[in-house]
Amino acid sequence: MFDEKYTEIVEPKYGIKRDFTHDEILTNNIYNKHQYSIDEEHRVDMTGYDTYSIDPDGCNDADDAFSIYTEDDKLYFAIHIADPTEYIELNSTLWDDIVNRTTTKYPSNRKPIHMMPNKVLALSSLQGDHHGNIKKAITILTEVDKTSFEPVNKIKILFTNVFVKKDNAYTYKQASILCDEIQAFNIGLKISESCKQRRSLNTKGIKLNEVSTAYPIYDASGAHLYEDTFGERMMKQMIAEFAIFANAFVGEYLKINLNMGIFRTCNASTWLQTLYNGITGDELLQEIITNGIRADYMSNVESHDLVGMTEYCHFTSPIRRLSDCICHYLLKYIHFKKDNYSIPFTDSELDALATRCLHVTRSEKKHQYLDIKFRLLQVMDTLISNNNTIEIGYYITGYSGLFLNIIICKINNYRVHMSYSLRVRNYSKDINPKNIKFITVTQVNCFTRYDENTIPELDQDILRA
């Protein structure tokens, strides 16, 4: 029942799947040089360094990888980002298709709907086969202090060739098990901790690192809840800190060299100052939801206060996000600027692209919330079938005049995050998001169009409270 309804209700919201025949036409010219191709003599050879990638299980669109190595008694840290724009000519039909799709879509328990055709993805992804492959990358390179593990001296941005092989591609689980054995992982954790501590001086947003929610996984018997181990959480936080470091540097680089780009912003400094210093990650997440704090895409420079950076962009996921591709073209323009290249985007074009990225991202957030809701209802149904009852925890976040907005935060002993809303007229009771209520549930109905009656006992508990 749930899988059939998912195919009918949720999956279509992710849009049109890729068409192999059409993709063959789109990728006819991907091996041809174009205006923003980087010649081999301008690429730095980093194929001699071990390069590692850590991604979710089943990932084949690895945007990022890293190397940690010692040279001349100095410790270096390199973040390598895939370079798909090497194969994409601006204003081509391939580029138009990427702009139209804007992001890769990830329907649950289904294959992704990639933003890029498979040929470009395979050429760009920083994963290799068992023999290894040379891939093109844009690398952020910095020296690291051997004692504090903080980045020191000048940070460089390089166009590179890197060597990637399957043996160095890990899942978060695999990496968490081997982190003490692989020196690059061990040092990487220390570098990420130093980056986090530096950010903590500028934002309470680092408290979000504490938040860990269970999520559905799937096997032949259906959907089940899984909670990351401590080691998996540490590995995810490490990769996230690497991305924040790179995105912040590129944001600053674009500001200094162009004062234009597509920036990820969140104006929340004043609001963050109102929060007490001892706030937990879960409390902060609850406050963010209740107060409607969210990030924007903008073509002008503003700070991202939740991550604690005065300049911030999305640069590290170009295989799956249009915004990152745009940053890559701008970086290449800066590289070629001395050759009197024309700028790839006008101010008005950047503004339109930023608006598109924002609208598509927000629309997809709604689809993801629906997807999560649907799958968590499926999990609840399975748990009730096996055990007759479950316990859920919930709190009310607000009332719009027609809809009462609720967050389900616990299913049995698992922390979850599931939005739920009820159509209610003239709701006049006090709303306190800190008041979490727990109820026993014996019935869950498959989601159709509205949340109402999917968890009947929850509806009854809220309306009679």
State what each model feature region is.
Residues 2-6, 27-464:
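Electropositive polyanion-binding surfaces
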Residues 1-26:
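Boundary/activation segment at the start of structured domains
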